[in-house]
């Protein structure tokens, strides 16, 4: 039996989120609806999640001592990493000492904080199908890896980055240095290490949201949402839709891969498993042990969206991944470099049938920073995609 307390009282169930962007904000809202006391942590003040949490804290989360001091001061029941750039060795030490429970586990947070840990787990430990790959610490190593078997075309990514930053495709020798420089500029921390992957000529890529939650018998069970299709530009998602049609064999293989990798990572919660698909063939790409940006579409397609599923699963509550209606999401970019922007056209956007908007409340806009998302549902995915893109296009961010 799960018992939940009352916020801001001695009985409170306290959850701390490390990372409070637009995804963290929705998790915090889902937790608050269940009467959980929330602590939103980020590296900058007034982050989206901090605007809705009971408590807002600003620290350098990659600094182990700062992280330890905050956790010991706040004494949360659960710590929920929402980004990669966190001092995971400290989380492992605190979890091992019984100070706090990390979602899904501190080991999972460490393995998924960069592309190397999770790729080696998937390909070398679990034997799951992936693209051919090498890890490189210099431009010379990158060139040697390409010449030694990876070949052209290939994809280069920093071992640690988010939202596609630093990711590029190399079509020939003339592109190698530019790709290395771009990866170095786009890495989340100063790491100087990249993964180079042989290019898979896939038909499409999906996100398979996978939930590990406690069932009625007290055992952890694995649940799958309907597959989410998405379009990425330079590694960053620009639209997604659910469900994405798949060959039954490919869906079965996708679920097998997702079950294997999430079972090894362990714990409870929602995972975003990214996969490449060609016909009946499936390759593992990446996994995030938390809600996924492409999964924002579930705010309009599912009875319980990905954020509610994550909140329920980490609290030991039952979950349902049932689909409510086909739907789509389309990103709204800042388009300007400014603080405290305003949005024109919100009324026009919401006149598009069966649409919703989420404006994230980020304090500062950049040209390609994700500032909101349009959501739409319809009788079919194609109509929903058209509506979402139309609504997103009517929202016009500008300087105040």
Curated annotation (Swiss-Prot):
Protein residues bound to N(1)-(5-phospho-beta-D-ribosyl)glycinamide: 22-23, 82, 293, 362, 369-370
GO cellular component labels: cytosol
Keyword hit for ATP-binding: yes
Family annotation (SUPFAM superfamilies): Glutathione synthetase ATP-binding domain-like, PreATP-grasp domain, Rudiment single hybrid motif
GO terms assigned for molecular function: ATP binding; magnesium ion binding; phosphoribosylglycinamide formyltransferase 2 activity; phosphoribosylglycinamide formyltransferase activity
Involved pathway(s): Purine metabolism; IMP biosynthesis via de novo pathway; N(2)-formyl-N(1)-(5-phospho-D-ribosyl)glycinamide from N(1)-(5-phospho-D-ribosyl)glycinamide (formate route): step 1/1
Top-rank taxon, per record: Bacteria
Enzyme Commission no: 6.3.1.21
Quaternary structure and partners: Homodimer.
Function statement: Involved in the de novo purine biosynthesis. Catalyzes the transfer of formate to 5-phospho-ribosyl-glycinamide (GAR), producing 5-phospho-ribosyl-N-formylglycinamide (FGAR). Formate is provided by PurU via hydrolysis of 10-formyl-tetrahydrofolate.
Official protein name in the record: Formate-dependent phosphoribosylglycinamide formyltransferase
The species this protein was found in: Cupriavidus metallidurans (strain ATCC 43123 / DSM 2839 / NBRC 102507 / CH34)
């Amino acid at each position: 039996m799960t018992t939940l307390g009352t916020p801001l009282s001695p009985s409170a169930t306290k959850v701390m989120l490390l990372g409070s962007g637009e995804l963290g904000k929705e998790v915090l809202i889902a937790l608050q609806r269940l009467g959980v006391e929330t602590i939103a942590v980020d590296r900058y003040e007034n982050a989206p999640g901090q605007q809705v949490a009971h408590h807002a804290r600003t620290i350098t989360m990659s600094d182990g001592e700062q992280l330890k001091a905050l956790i010991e001061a706040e004494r949360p029941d659960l710590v929920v990493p929402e980004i990669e750039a966190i001092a995971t060795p400290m989380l492992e030490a605190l979890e091992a000492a019984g100070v706090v429970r990390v979602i899904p586990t501190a080991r999972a947070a460490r393995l998924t904080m960069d592309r190397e840990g999770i790729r080696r787990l998937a390909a070398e430990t679990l034997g799951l199908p992936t693209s051919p790959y090498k890890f490189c610490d210099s431009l010379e190593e990158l060139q040697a890896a390409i010449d030694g078997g990876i070949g052209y075309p290939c994809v280069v990514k920093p071992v640690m980055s988010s939202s596609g930053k630093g990711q590029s495709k190399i079509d020939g020798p003339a592109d190698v240095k530019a790709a290395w420089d771009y990866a170095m500029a786009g890495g989340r921390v100063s790491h100087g290490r990249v993964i180079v992957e042989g290019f898979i000529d896939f038909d499409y890529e999906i996100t398979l949201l996978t939930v590990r939650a406690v069932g009625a018998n007290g055992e952890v069970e694995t649940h799958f949402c309907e597959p989410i299709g998405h379009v990425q530009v330079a590694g960053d998602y620009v639209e997604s839709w659910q469900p994405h049609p798949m060959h039954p064999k490919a869906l079965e293989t996708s679920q097998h891969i997702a079950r294997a990798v999430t079972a090894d990572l362990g714990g409870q919660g929602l995972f975003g498993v990214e996969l490449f698909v060609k016909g009946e063939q499936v390759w593992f790409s990446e996994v995030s042990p938390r809600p996924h940006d492409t999964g924002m579409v579930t705010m309009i397609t599912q009875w319980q969206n990905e954020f509610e599923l994550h909140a329920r699963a980490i609290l030991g509550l039952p979950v349902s991944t049932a689909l409510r209606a086909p739907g789509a999401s389309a990103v709204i970019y800042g388009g300007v470099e400014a603080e405290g922007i305003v949005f024109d056209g919100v009324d026009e956007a919401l006149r598009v049938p069966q649409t919703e908007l989420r404006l994230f409340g980020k304090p500062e806009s950049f040209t390609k920073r994700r500032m909101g998302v349009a959501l739409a549902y319809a009788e079919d995915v194609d109509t929903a995609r058209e509506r979402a893109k139309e609504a997103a296009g009517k929202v016009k961010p500008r300087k105040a």
